[in-house]
Amino acid sequence: MNYIKFDEKKPLDVIPIGRVTIDFNPNEINRPLEESRTFTKYLGGSPGNIAVGLARLGKKVGFLSTVSDDQFGNFVVNYLKNEGIDISQINRAKNGEKLGLTFTEILSPKESSILMYRKGIADLQLSSKEVSEDYIKSAKAIVISGTALSKSPSREAAFVALEYAKKHNTRIIFDLDYREYTWNCKEEIAIYYSLAARMSDVIMGSREEFNLMEGLISPEESNDKETAERWIGYGNKIVVIKHGKDGSTAYLHDGTSYKIKPFPVKLLKSFGGGDAYASAFIYGIMEGWDVIDALEFGSASAAMLVASHSCSEAMPKVEEIKQFIKEKKEEHGEMVVRG
């Protein structure tokens, strides 16, 4: 069912916009970060991971960001290119800004943390002049990362992209993607998140992220239904609110809602599932699936990622996700995540 109409004449399917980083995941797990001696390098950052996830699922993907003008920047550009992602709109930082670095700590399957270096960061240097109207026009949808709204000039660039998308019937998917270290205060988060959300067609985020977005207009925490109704009232077609291990719910503009639970899986780490969830869910709605099927697909992809060492490198293909779902249903029953 087409809850959202995408312009099928456009050559690109999706353009994620914003953060791309380098992840260093420890090879020695179940120990503190200070005791880890060796790491494996991966591409990271939510928009970067979502781009890779969608490309693995067969979508035609572009990417709009700024990366460092050094070896790590080369790594990111080459990695995305090798995944079949269009790199024509990836810019290079001009004043020595670097890619963000993320070191992960895996103390146990349920206890993980991340250490981020985000000072003088390249992706926040994307300027409004580097946002091509023709490029945004060429895509069926863009994915805006909340982190891209946190600092200038990236903030202004993101809103220019939003304006171009509205002008040219390019659908807007807003991934709240909150990272505390990039914002000055909670009021700033609420203002800029709300402005972007009022322009979006789909919003995806955790309950905590929605609370931050609604901090000024609703000082008392809203329940999920109230939150969904608020943002659907501004024109969104789908609002997805995630509750971690308790699952997630998609609220639709026609008043219906669908809930999905996580697939049972042996965890390796407690991070990385959200980007896989987003890419697989976006794939499902772009394919015209029922929302419950898109949610199930997203939940399956997320489960596969939290059982893997990496994020971007482990992004699955369509048949791999379908096989995972088939096996889990054979083991646990047809309604394993829908009941």
From Swiss-Prot:
Regarding protein family, the annotation reads: Belongs to the carbohydrate kinase PfkB family.
What protein is this chain from? 5-dehydro-2-deoxygluconokinase
State which residue ranges cross the membrane.
none
Which NCBIfam families does this entry report, sorted A to Z? Answer: myo_inos_iolC_N (TIGR04382)
**GO terms (BP aspect):** inositol catabolic process
Record field: catalytic activity: 5-dehydro-2-deoxy-D-gluconate + ATP = 6-phospho-5-dehydro-2-deoxy-D-gluconate + ADP + H(+)
Q: Which Pfam families match?
A: PfkB
**E.C. no:** 2.7.1.92
Q: Which domain of life is it from?
A: Bacteria
Q: What is the lineage of its organism?
A: Bacteria, Bacillati, Bacillota, Clostridia, Eubacteriales
Q: Which organism's genome codes for this protein? A: Clostridium tetani (strain Massachusetts / E88)
Function summary? Catalyzes the phosphorylation of 5-dehydro-2-deoxy-D-gluconate (2-deoxy-5-keto-D-gluconate or DKG) to 6-phospho-5-dehydro-2-deoxy-D-gluconate (DKGP).
